[in-house]
């Protein structure tokens, strides 16, 4: 009878290594029925053998006692079956796989896996064969035990599959987050770097350059709003370009720290660049110089963006984003400040001196130039608050 189950495909590797007998205990040891007295109130294991078990109250006392004796014999035969320790083991594995938190990589985490149960089957079969046969003399009970073990094993495989799907989802979700977070960090660094660049510019721009920028900007606004430039305005446009270039040189000198011999240190240069943002210092200086040379229209064309990208070593997208931030944080505050000065009825003068003439440190006396045909128009347009910059 036992030979029918020797070649079952579900239990490959029935021959294995030895296992201490204390792991499973003696399957034929006497068991106390006090621990399972509640089973007497449940349905019988084989209802077809006891068709009147549901009406025990109507039975004679002698017949009720015989039914209870039969149930006790069935329980004893199940508890004493050679495969019962294996059934209890896989039931415990299913319970652990359901309620135990899983931590991959932790020692002992595979104690409830299906592979571990395959090893347990091999160990159990070798141990039990050395002591007694695997099956009893009751084929029906043997079949019941085999089917119960199969059902629990399928359940264990399903639980393992659910855990694999959960782990796969968590891994993919974490990978997706890790792949997107660096982009967000780069955007934050880029915004922070542009903000620090604009703050450095407003702090380091020399006060002596601001009046010349104001006059140049007034002339540029008058040219854009008045139409064709007059003779005097044309000559002053070149002077504006010269002032812008001088301002760019002054900007570079004001930002650069005094030469102490440590500027050649590449490590300190990297730290300085990292503190200022993601763009190198040389690249921001080049783009600032271009911005102040084209304040009347600070919108570089595609060709100019390509040229700036080559000069700075940045990408076209980085150059474009820098100019977007610069127009918002550098150019616009200057325009707002000029508009406030014009709305008060006097031209912009940071030192509070008359526009007729003043002397700055290290420069000769400067007087206002003779008003040309376009400069008067620019002043009128400025007084009316109708300047057009971009």
From Swiss-Prot:
Location in or out of the cell: Cytoplasm; Nucleus
Q: Which GO terms describe its molecular function?
A: DNA-binding transcription activator activity, RNA polymerase II-specific; sequence-specific DNA binding
Annotated DNA-binding ranges?
Answer: 272-334
Q: Which GO terms describe its cellular component?
A: cytoplasm; nucleus; transcription regulator complex
**Ranges annotated as biased composition (Basic and acidic residues):** 188-202
The segment annotated Interaction with DNA runs over 299-329
Q: Does the keyword Cytoplasm apply?
A: yes
Record's InterPro entries?
HD, Homeodomain-like_sf, KN_HD, PKNOX/Meis_N, TALE_homeobox
Q: Does the keyword Nucleus apply?
A: yes
Tissue-level expression: In the embryo, displays a broad expression pattern with high levels observed in tissues of neural cell fate such as midbrain, hindbrain, dorsal portion of the neural tube, and neural crest-derived branchial arches. Widely expressed in the adult with highest levels in brain and spleen.
- Alphabetically ordered keywords of this record: Activator, Cytoplasm, Developmental protein, DNA-binding, Homeobox, Nucleus, Transcription
MEIS N-terminal domain residues are: 108-191
Q: Which PROSITE patterns does the record cross-reference, listed alphabetically?
A: HOMEOBOX_2
Q: How does it assemble?
A: Interacts with pbx1 isoform b.
What does the similarity note say?
Belongs to the TALE/MEIS homeobox family.
Protein role: Induces expression of a number of neural crest marker genes as part of a heterodimer with isoform b of pbx1, to specify neural crest cell fate. Binds to a highly conserved region in the promoter of the neural crest marker gene zic3.
**Which protein is depicted?**
Homeobox protein Meis1
Lineage at the top is:
Eukaryota, Metazoa, Chordata, Craniata, Vertebrata
Could you tell me the gene encoding this protein?
meis1
